[in-house]
UniProtKB/Swiss-Prot annotation:
It comes from Metamycoplasma hominis. One of its GO terms (cellular component) is cytosol. Homodimer. Gene3D superfamilies: Nucleoside phosphorylase/phosphoribosyltransferase catalytic domain, Pyrimidine nucleoside phosphorylase-like, C-terminal domain. PANTHER family: THYMIDINE PHOSPHORYLASE. It catalyses: thymidine + phosphate = 2-deoxy-alpha-D-ribose 1-phosphate + thymine. This is Thymidine phosphorylase. InterPro entries: Glycosyl_Trfase_fam3, Nuc_phospho_transferase, PYNP-like_C_sf, PYNP_C, Thymidine/pyrmidine_PPase. The keyword Endoplasmic reticulum does not apply. One of its GO terms (molecular function) is thymidine phosphorylase activity. The keyword Manganese does not apply. The gene is deoA. The enzymes which catalyze the reversible phosphorolysis of pyrimidine nucleosides are involved in the degradation of these compounds and in their utilization as carbon and energy sources, or in the rescue of pyrimidine bases for nucleotide synthesis.
């Protein structure tokens, strides 16, 4: 797959939907799973920018699965806005833990329930989405979901004590708050700009040889569509190194304020 991708890179076929589908499905089919759920991200922060192109890709991957007797479901989800309230590495793990304990952000929690219920129905563990969502409720409320997460970490030799309440596991040396200069409903115009700022903080790589700063990231104190008062903290940036003041300008240029809310869909479409 890596060799084929290198060829696509130099032949102008990176955007080829049949080649994208074969790249994704070759890896998914190799897992041996009979039921596979694919989350196709769509929007300015995703590889697939157009909903119709995303649907075309989804349908093609379902057809590939059918030819090999696999049950495939595809969800097309929104990447116009950041999902949840965190962007980074450790900071996203902590958000996942909050969600497993029933305290996650509304949009991220909805993705969990939507994807989980789709897969439970696909695998015939639940008769419909209503029953499936009740099953997810149960394992979150009785802590089975969180305890399974701890078991995964432990069985791979990880230290689960880092997730205890008094742990200093997430301990960035530098932080910078970004303050609202006006009031109104927050709108994030470009999710990709938030990803680029997180990368510049150290949460991602711009070159293969770059190292990752696991403390680096962004916390969204305010989310898209939330009403903000002038002087409120909008976002908090974290890093293990001094934070470039220019990054604040980059985030502020990626947002705007309006007098009314705007429509946001978490899941655009489901294909089965």
């Amino acid at each position: 797959d890596k060799k084929i991708y290198a060829l696509r890179d130099v032949t102008g076929t990176v955007q080829s939907i049949p080649l994208i589908a074969s790249s994704i499905m070759s890896k998914k089919l190799a897992t041996g799973s009979n039921c596979i759920l694919l989350d196709v991200k769509c929007g300015n922060g995703a590889f697939m920018k157009d909903i119709n192109e995303a649907k075309k890709l989804g349908k093609l991957m379902i057809e590939i699965g059918k030819k090999l007797n696999r049950k495939i479901a595809v969800e097309i989800t929104n990447m116009q806005q950041p999902l949840g309230k965190t962007i980074g590495n450790k900071i996203e793990v902590l958000e996942a833990i909050d969600t497993l304990n029933g305290h996650g952000p509304k949009d991220f929690t909805e993705i969990i329930y939507s994807s989980g219920s789709t897969l439970l129905v696909l695998a015939q563990k639940a008769k419909d989405e209503v029953e499936a969502r009740k099953m997810i409720d149960e394992v979150i409320n009785n802590k089975k979901a969180y305890n399974k997460f701890l078991e995964w970490i432990s069985r791979q030799g990880g230290n689960i004590k880092v997730f205890e309440k008094d742990s200093k596991w997430f301990n960035p040396q530098y932080k910078q708050e970004i303050i609202a200069s006006q009031s109104g409903y927050l709108k994030i115009k470009s999710r990709i700009d938030f990803g680029l700022v997180a990368m510049k903080l150290g949460a991602g790589r711009s070159k293969k040889e770059d190292s990752i700063d696991y403390e680096a990231g962004i916390y969204l104190n305010k989310s898209s569509n939330e009403y903000v008062n002038k002087g409120d903290v909008l976002f908090t940036m974290y890093s293990s190194k001094p934070i470039n003041p220019e990054l604040q300008k980059e985030l502020l240029s990626a947002i705007e304020f309006s007098e009314s809310k705007h429509d946001i869909q978490t899941v655009f479409a489901k294909l089965m």
